[in-house]
């Protein structure tokens, strides 16, 4: 329960007496950004309880902010007396028409903010503002193409969906082919770990946008060179076929091996004691996914170890999200071995070197590879290659590259 101390009540009342129009309640600062800009997977409106308490002592409106990324959250906060005004920060950068779409009842057309914080990362280092989900945050203008073309997009992941939509908006005739039964690509797997479910909203939004734009979508359709030569002769071909999880062939002799993607997709079923090779975002999220619930006492829970060769987990991940996940792994009892390199693997043992000392794990059931991705092979002559099959990166990179290319097509 929020303790509205005497000084806080005093300051609020003094501001009201001085003629303030309303009091804005936030939290955190540039050092503790996790409070002012909460990470993905955290609860919405974390300062609402403080706003509600302050509101009880004032006669002017009170506002609050942070993770109010859907209209229903704002409506519920106001209806329940938590606040009078909801401030929309990052979601309004993600979709500048957020409020207008909410007012018009077009909530499904709101581009979803996932709370990743990459919009502000650039600004803090003197770079332009950007957005993972909205590559057009600086300029929404998409000019019609001077020459209308027929365009084939291969791959229904984020890059393929973005390229197909922008090409269609420019007046091209677009066909999008996806070899599986669902759009989304690796984003579907990225949405599986704890706290990442909001990525499903991105897939839903991008799919709905393609359908509304009239893009022809073919699922369960694996494009071949012969198909391009016959059915798609004369088309501009954009290949966004994604990437595949890497495996270390020399370590494949262990009793059970699989990739993190195998686990997240449900194709792989690891044993009780799991060793994850790689402490990047994918490795740590998979460890979190597999590890026991905090304070769970069931003896069948897994024992998870993460082996990372560098001196830090999740290099390149945002500070707030990284901190939350690291703390959760520690509370769950996940063993983390930094500055450690696996030197030898046989059918029953995993040997790694840390600080010059050799360590042996001889009771593991499963070895999981989370050592990155390799671009999917492109077998289409003359195709424009986009997204992860061009260069493996993050979601922001894939969407931005596809947007920039399609805008000039």
Residue ranges and their predicted role:
Residues 20, 203, 214-216, 235, ...:
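Short, conserved active-site loop motifs that form the nucleotide-linked donor/cofactor pocket
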Residues 17-21, 53-61, 206-218, 332-335:
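A structural motif corresponding to the C-terminal end of an alpha-helix
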Residues 20, 83, 233-235, 363-365:
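Local beta-strand N-terminus motif with an aromatic residue
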Residues 34-38, 186-191, 251-252:
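Short acidic, glycine/proline-rich loop/turn micro-motifs
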Residues 40-43, 81, 103-106, 192-196, ...:
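Short, hinge-like loop/turn segments at secondary-structure boundaries
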Residues 72, 149-176, 183, 218-230, ...:
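Rossmann-like dinucleotide/flavin-binding elements
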Residues 176-213, 287-342:
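Rossmann-like dinucleotide-binding cores of NAD(P)H-dependent redox enzymes
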Residues 1-154, 158-162, 166-169, 173-174, ...:
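Flavin-dependent oxidoreductase catalytic cores
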């Amino acid at each position: 329960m929020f303790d509205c101390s005497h000084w806080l009540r005093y300051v609020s009342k003094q501001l009201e007496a001085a003629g303030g129009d309303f009091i804005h309640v936030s939290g955190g600062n540039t050092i503790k950004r996790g409070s002012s800009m909460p990470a993905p997977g955290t609860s919405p409106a974390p300062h609402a309880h403080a706003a509600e308490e302050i509101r009880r002592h004032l006669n002017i409106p009170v506002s609050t902010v942070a993770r109010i990324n859907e209209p229903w959250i704002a409506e519920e906060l106001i209806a329940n007396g938590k606040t009078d005004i909801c401030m929309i920060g990052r979601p309004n950068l993600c979709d500048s028409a957020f409020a207008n779409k909410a007012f018009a009842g077009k909530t499904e057309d709101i581009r979803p903010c996932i709370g990743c914080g990459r919009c502000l990362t650039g600004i803090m280092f003197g770079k332009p503002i950007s957005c993972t989900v909205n590559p057009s945050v600086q300029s929404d203008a998409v000019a019609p193409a001077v020459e209308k073309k027929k365009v084939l997009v291969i791959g229904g992941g984020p890059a393929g969906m973005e390229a197909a939509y922008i090409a269609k908006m420019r007046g091209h005739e677009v066909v999008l082919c996806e070899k599986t039964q669902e759009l989304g690509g690796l984003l579907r797997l990225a949405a599986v770990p704890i706290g990442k479910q909001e990525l499903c909203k991105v897939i839903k939004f991008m799919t709905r946008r393609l359908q509304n734009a009239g893009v022809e979508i073919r699922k369960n359709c694996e494009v071949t060179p012969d198909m391009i030569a016959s059915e798609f002769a004369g088309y501009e071909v954009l290949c966004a076929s994604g990437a595949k999880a890497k495996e270390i062939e020399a370590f494949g002799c262990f009793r059970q091996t699989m990739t993190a993607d195998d686990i997240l997709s449900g194709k792989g079923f690891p044993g009780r004691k799991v060793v994850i090779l790689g402490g990047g975002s994918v490795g740590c999220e998979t460890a979190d996914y597999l590890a026991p619930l905090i304070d769970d006492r069931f003896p069948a829970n897994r024992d998870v170890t993460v082996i990372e060769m560098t001196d830090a987990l999740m290099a390149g991940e945002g500070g707030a999200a990284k901190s939350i996940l690291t703390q959760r792994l520690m509370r769950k009892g996940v063993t983390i071995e930094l500055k450690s390199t696996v030197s030898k693997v046989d059918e029953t043992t995993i040997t790694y070197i840390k600080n010059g000392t050799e360590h042996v794990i001889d009771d593991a059931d499963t070895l999981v590879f989370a050592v990155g991705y390799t671009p999917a092979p492109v077998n289409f002559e003359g195709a424009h290659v986009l997204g992860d099959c061009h260069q493996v990166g993050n979601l922001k990179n894939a969407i931005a590259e596809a947007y920039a290319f399609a805008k000039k097509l």
